[in-house]
Amino acid sequence: MAALLLCVGAVAAKKEKKPVQYNEKGEIIKTGLNFGPLPAVAYDADKGFQLGAILQIYNYGDGSKYPNYFNRWYMEASWFTKGSMLFQFQHDNKNLIPNVRWSTSVSYNIDKAFDFYGFNGYGAYYDFERMGLSNDKKAIKNGAEPDPLLYRYNPFYRINKTTLYAKSDFIGHITEDLYWEVGYHFRWYNQDKIDRVSINKKKNWYDTFPSGPDSFANVKQEDMRTELDDRAYMPTLFEQYMDWGIIKSGEVYNKNGKPHMFDSSIRLGLMYDTRDKEGAPTRGIWAEGHVILAPKWLGSSNSYYRYGLTFRNYWPIVDNDVLTFAYRLSYEGTFGKVKGQQNPYYALSYNTIMGNESDKDGFGSYRTTRGIQRTRLVGLDMGLWTVEFRYKFVDFKLWKQNMAFSLTAFTDGSMATRGRDMSFRGEAGSFAGYKAYIEGRYAEVPSKYQERYYKTIDCGSYGEVRSLKEMPHSTFGLGLRFIMNTNFIVAFEYGLPFSRFYKKDSPYYMQDGGGAFYINLGYLF
């Protein structure tokens, strides 16, 4: 943290040459450009180490709008040691077009281990018990023979995803607090099954995910074991959904058989905003609603129509930004039908946003429901809620910058209120595979019952499939934030799902994972 203070403070201080002025709260009024560089360092067992850098630049102009800014630039470049990478650029401009705010963003993301936990929340069982099994490396080091069936199970819930995303949003006044919103959003997807050679790279032979002949691609000759011959190709959940017809081929592959999909949409919306400031608001309402229109004639591979509604409210409990109560209610839904088909699955896994932020992967993880897995909830309609207490326990001036530390206590929640159709539409022979890998048994089922039994996946009938009735996915946690000049905010947060503390005989025990720690930027809202 000390290094962070030195980094951001020194860079920002170099740009401060004018005499210091203060506002009514005793804050230094910032003018001109402020720079906020930050290293991006993290680790993921499937993607490897993340190394990169983030740079935020704020233009406060003559300071007349402080703590709000005139312009903002955000740049990020990150690489992962196993091949994933992220490049992102955002620009938010309030004065280029008179009386119109223009926000644009471009990003390119290669994720070779993107989370995929199925559809409809608890309707897709999460096999946490199998996820927790592994070989005892210490025992193996002392001479014990590894069990080739206790391989790392994480890749079962992963896909290979590359996305190019670009957007341009415009927001203008209708009245003092009411705004219109218009935007164009474009995505190019390359989503397919995992790259097994990459996932198994540099793993011990007994940890490699069963991939048929590919299981041996990165195994040294001296480590080859005959036991590996017994490990047949293990389909991932994504591959099973394809086999069963839950995900249609036309949602993944184009007419040339390539896993390339296009998403071209127009967004129209309204926003009501009475916040006292944008970066860390302490009072006011911020509400918005928009529709997403993505017809084929606009360039989309699959037509769909969605909407998003969000209401945020901020209440000062102790004035002067000391203690704030904030909450958020959000809903993502689907409307209309396109020749009777559902919305394409790849369009459902976002919390959609207009303005100076980009869409967030959801529902699950940092920007939506802290503490549960990324994209744990994917459905046609989904609700989201957040309640926070924000306590700024210290603020000070350093290098002519306004600095503060804040604690956050929060609870998040989300729920799939309308799920995708999970009816079995694949080859009858693949149903046995479903029972083998999801239910853990290989019982033969007469073909005349297979489709009827399979439909129980989204109604939770006992005994046929491991599935649960959907209910709220709730979490709680704490966070610490370093704040510089209101807008540059570095967050450290840890979230835990309530399901982790259910009784072990509860069918919902550990269905949202075991919790997660995050290092990120800003407040969620």
Residue ranges and their predicted role:
Residues 256, 266-269, 277-401, 417-419, ...:
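C-terminal outer-membrane beta-barrel translocator/porin domains of Gram-negative envelope proteins
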Residues 43-45, 57-59, 77-83, 93-95, ...:
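Transmembrane beta-strands of outer-membrane beta-barrel pores
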Residues 33-35, 47-51, 55, 69-71, ...:
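Residues that define the transmembrane beta-barrel architecture of outer-membrane proteins
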Residues 482, 511-525:
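Outer-membrane beta-barrel "beta-signal"
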Residues 16-25, 42, 105-107, 114-320:
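Transmembrane beta-strand segments of outer-membrane beta-barrel domains in Gram-negative
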Residues 34-43, 68-81, 87, 285-295, ...:
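Transmembrane beta-strand segments that form the barrel wall of outer-membrane beta-barrel proteins
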Residues 35-37, 71-75, 101-106, 178-182, ...:
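Transmembrane beta-strands of outer-membrane beta-barrel proteins
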Residues 14-15, 21-33, 61-70, 96-102, ...:
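Short loop/turn motifs that connect adjacent beta-strands in outer-membrane beta-barrel proteins
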